[in-house]
């Protein structure tokens, strides 16, 4: 049987964590990644070179590569001294390869091949873009990193230039997908930013593949303050122009006082789930008692193994293929 074609849409840490888990399964992975980041090492490079943001792309390439390889470790290495302090070597390699090939998309393909990744990593657009936001009070905020600093409710986000075209490979992947997964990650700056690229939303909506949203566990200050799971989904649907999400994976776990206090100090709290409200809109809600893990310093994160297994199980419900058996359970 052919492998299931799973397309991931997003950016930031969330997408790379999910990709790292899914690479262990017998699926054909394509990650469509936002290129609107303008902070940190990525921002410095973009100030010098007018290229799409390399940072989120770098993280996903590393996640899909052989995690034990020296090349993969080198790709994620970050300098700490002198004039290149703060720069990731992977970002510099992407920038250098872009100069060599004169094409950001070609640079990503070349580096993906060098690192022997499982699957494909595709920028949502091959154009250098800036993400802006219109706040509910009408103020326009320019640049991704400035959006959450305003601590205002976001009405919508948009890209400059506004006529950017998608990577054709991204459109083809959406058309051919068996399952499309959005998130987890910053709602507006990592997920919805991809839908701002002309053609992405249309291809997503018209794809025959079921669509799944992986909800964040905690609200994000300055971006999703007070948002429920449904609020996250509603924001995605507003950008796309119509409802399309069929499944949502979300946490219903309760957290101890230490965890809640740590997040309250950052003006963040658990994303609330109203299962009946979601099911009323024909969204199939998937949860797990151990979807989230808590670190020693009381930070909550998706359990990579549990999340990727849930996504694969959903895919198996939809597609006839050979079930995956972990190597330690094979006879």
Identify the role of each PLM range.
Residues 127-188:
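Active-site gating loop/helix substructures
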Residues 13-14:
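Hydrophobic/small residue at the entry helix of a nucleotide-binding pocket
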